[in-house]
């Protein structure tokens, strides 16, 4: 199929002073039709915004006028005409059409409202995601998500990191545990990978020095909360000859840069979401684990023993404490007990009970985990076995530590949680085009 009237502009690109009397063609969805008898207004929507098409009955071809009045909402149209300044119209102009071509007429009634005038439940919107994406707020979230990932790549690439890709079908659990999706790989059992961790460490032995990956991870955890997904997008780095303090600095600087870029490049999307974003101040506050549990025990009804994990109540308590003290939402919890961190986290030499590990937190939830890694083969093998895992199953990983593995550190941060906390989105599923959670496998 070839278009007789190819698009010349997005609706946001039309500049009256530059275009003059030249013809323009916009293509998109019929957002609204207002028939006032002697005048008809058609609002056409595309990815970048809206354009008002103005038809005055006495000044336009009767066939075009009658066709415009009968347009079905959400039909696909191509409109060609002359743009004129009109301060009351979207983007400050209107188009006086010489042709309106219906490229595909929508059925009626629609599965959901796209104007934002009628609210719909999240599951209703996800069931008809193709319609939900036509809502300005939904589009804004995914434009910002795109900018977040673009900024991440830009920041890390400029800092000398090489983008890599690790396999998503693996034979061994990355970090132990049972939260894996088993699959059949020809005649063998395999799993969907829960993290690129082991592979990015192997790359340190290969001499790539500093790497990053943006890709899917899979967790077979039966959470059913607003903060959890079973398929998510993880942003990971690994870097040789850097310790945990070094990579914490990389992480906080990257987060600040991402916020800067979103503010600079997605002002219209932020406006659509009615959000005024500010750049987090660096360096982020560092709260040792021992101090964190003291805060929880003193300021909440929850009690956390040393060596216990931090739940939702604890995270909120610490987050509020930090916010009151600094006015900032981002901070680190450092120096976690070795036994509750993954086997590859490096213990302190003078106190092996504490690891060189950290979580980067937002006021409302955990965003990232990282650590300096164990780079000594025998120590790493012993840690694997101390957690009840079979070291033979990690041979492909351990071999890389026998022949010259440099000291290295790294972290992973969830893209969805980063976007969710940035935009104060209530449910993490709103930050994924087609989310996979405990109950949803389609669309």
Curated annotation (Swiss-Prot):
One of its GO terms (molecular function) is ATP binding. It catalyses: tRNA(Asx) + L-aspartate + ATP = L-aspartyl-tRNA(Asx) + AMP + diphosphate. ATP binds at residues 219-221, 227-229, 366, 414-417. Disulfide bonds: none annotated. SUPFAM superfamilies: Class II aaRS and biotin synthetases, Nucleic acid-binding proteins. The record marks 90 as: Important for tRNA non-discrimination. Signal peptide: none annotated. InterPro entries: Aa-tRNA-synt_II, aa-tRNA-synth_II, aa-tRNA-synth_II/BPL/LPL, Asp-tRNA_synthase_2, Asp/Asn-tRNA-synth_IIb, NA-bd_OB-fold, NA-bd_OB_tRNA. GO terms for biological process: aspartyl-tRNA aminoacylation. It is found in: Cytoplasm. The keyword Aminoacyl-tRNA synthetase applies. Mg(2+) 3 binds at residue 366. Its cofactor is Mg(2+). The keyword Oxidoreductase does not apply. Keywords: Aminoacyl-tRNA synthetase, ATP-binding, Cytoplasm, Ligase, Magnesium, Metal-binding, Nucleotide-binding, Protein biosynthesis. One of its GO terms (cellular component) is aminoacyl-tRNA synthetase multienzyme complex. Homodimer. Belongs to the class-II aminoacyl-tRNA synthetase family. Type 2 subfamily. This is Aspartate--tRNA(Asp/Asn) ligase.
């Amino acid at each position: 199929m070839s278009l007789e009237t190819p698009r010349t502009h997005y609706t946001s690109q039309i500049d009256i002073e530059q275009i003059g009397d030249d013809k323009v063609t916009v293509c998109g969805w019929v957002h609204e039709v207002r028939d006032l008898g002697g005048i008809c207004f058609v609002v056409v929507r595309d990815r970048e915004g809206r354009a008002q098409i103005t038809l005055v009955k006495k000044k336009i071809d009767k066939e075009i006028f009658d066709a415009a009045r009968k347009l079905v909402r959400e039909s696909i149209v191509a409109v060609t005409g002359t743009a004129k300044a009109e301060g009351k119209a979207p983007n400050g102009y209107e188009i006086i059409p010489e042709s309106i071509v219906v490229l595909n007429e929508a059925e009626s009634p629609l599965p959901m409202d796209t104007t934002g005038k009628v609210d719909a439940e999240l599951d209703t919107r996800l069931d008809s995601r193709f319609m939900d994406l036509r809502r300005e707020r939904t589009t804004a979230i995914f434009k910002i998500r795109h900018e977040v990932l673009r900024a991440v790549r830009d920041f890390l690439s400029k800092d000398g990191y090489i983008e890599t890709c690790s396999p998503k079908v693996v034979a061994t659990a990355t970090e132990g545990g049972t939260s894996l999706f088993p699959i059949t790989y020809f005649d063998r059992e395999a799993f969907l990978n829960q993290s690129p961790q082991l592979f990015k460490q192997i790359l340190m032995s290969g001499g790539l020095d500093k790497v990053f990956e943006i890709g899917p991870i899979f967790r077979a955890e039966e959470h059913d909360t607003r903060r959890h997904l079973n398929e998510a997008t993880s942003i990971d780095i690994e870097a040789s000859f850097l310790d945990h303090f070094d990579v914490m600095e990389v992480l906080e600087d990257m987060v600040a840069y991402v916020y800067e870029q979103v503010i600079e490049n997605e002002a219209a999307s932020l406006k659509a979401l009615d959000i005024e974003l500010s750049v987090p101040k660096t360096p982020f506050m560092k709260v040792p684990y021992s101090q964190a549990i003291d805060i929880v025990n003193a300021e909440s009804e929850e009690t956390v023993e040393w060596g216990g994990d931090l739940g939702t109540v604890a995270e909120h308590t610490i987050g509020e404490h930090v916010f009151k003290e600094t006015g900032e939402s981002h901070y680190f919890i450092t120096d976690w007990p070795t036994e509750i961190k993954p086997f590859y986290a490096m213990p302190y030499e003078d106190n092996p009970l504490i690891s060189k590990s950290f979580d980067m937190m937002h006021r409302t939830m955990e965003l990232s985990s990282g650590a300096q890694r164990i780079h000594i083969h025998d120590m790493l093998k012993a840690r694997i076995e101390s957690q009840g895992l079979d070291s033979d199953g990690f041979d492909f990983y351990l071999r890389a530590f026998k022949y010259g593995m440099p000291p290295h550190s790294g972290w992973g941060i969830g893209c969805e949680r980063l976007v969710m906390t940035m935009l104060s989105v209530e449910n993490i599923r709103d930050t994924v085009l087609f989310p996979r959670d405990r109950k949803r496998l389609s669309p």
